[in-house]
């Protein structure tokens, strides 16, 4: 876990020791954060690999920024989460749209949605009832998509695409979306990876994107290098 933290630092990491197994989460995605009456969610939709030269790296970032298919998918999730948040919050807004986050092995497109909880006594379970699972996992329409996933997948996902987080004594909370999350049980290691399929998805590219998301674990850490431009 410490090696992965150093090699692939992300914002919503977690380590859980159940006594019989371990969960190592290197999730870069915020499911929701509650701070007082403010609730924030930050869905992630859109992935591109880093380049092996400065020119290639900049090119990959620009292509992700301009990709109309990915932006349409991201906007679909934003609209879905605005609707989900609207059940428990007022003044729902989108302060950041199509932001590019930089990681050692890839770029990710994210957007931020915020709202003000409509009641003082809204509990964490009410938030989960409205938001879970994350719209970035299901796509839209949410219930129909979940029915399709259930009919296609023959085994439960376990922790994968669930949520890991904490609740403070003041009832503030922060939970990730359990992607890039490893389950260790005895000598067995599980890592769930996947992606969203839409009408104009290309099978080859979707498969390559799924493998890219697993590179933090499947390839040697020293293979990766990155460029940072300071302005």
Indicate residue ranges for each PLM-predicted region.
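Extended alpha-helical targeting/anchoring segments
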Residues: 1-231
């Amino acid at each position: 876990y410490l090696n992965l933290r150093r090699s692939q630092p992300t914002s919503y990491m977690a380590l859980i020791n159940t006594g019989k197994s371990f969960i190592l989460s290197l999730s870069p995605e915020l499911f929701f954060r509650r701070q007082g009456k403010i609730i924030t969610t930050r869905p992630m939709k859109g992935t591109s690999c880093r380049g092996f030269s400065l020119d290639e790296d900049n090119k990959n970032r620009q292509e992700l920024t301009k990709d109309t298919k990915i932006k349409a998918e991201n906007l679909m999730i934003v609209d879905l989460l605005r609707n989900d948040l609207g059940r428990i919050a007022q003044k729902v807004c989108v302060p950041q749209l199509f932001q590019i986050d930089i990681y050692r092995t890839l770029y990710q497109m994210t957007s931020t949605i915020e709202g003000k909880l409509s009641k003082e006594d809204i509990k964490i379970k009410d938030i989960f009832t409205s938001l879970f699972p994350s719209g970035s996992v299901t796509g839209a329409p949410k219930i129909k998509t979940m029915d399709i996933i259930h009919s296609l997948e023959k085994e439960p996902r376990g922790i994968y695409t669930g949520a890991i987080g904490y609740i403070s004594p003041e009832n503030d909370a922060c939970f990730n979306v359990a992607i890039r999350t490893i389950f260790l049980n005895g000598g067995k290691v599980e890592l769930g990876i996947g992606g969203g399929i839409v009408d104009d998805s290309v099978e080859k590219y979707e498969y390559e994107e799924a493998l890219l998301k697993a590179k933090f674990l499947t390839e040697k850490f020293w293979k990766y290098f990155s460029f940072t431009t300071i302005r």
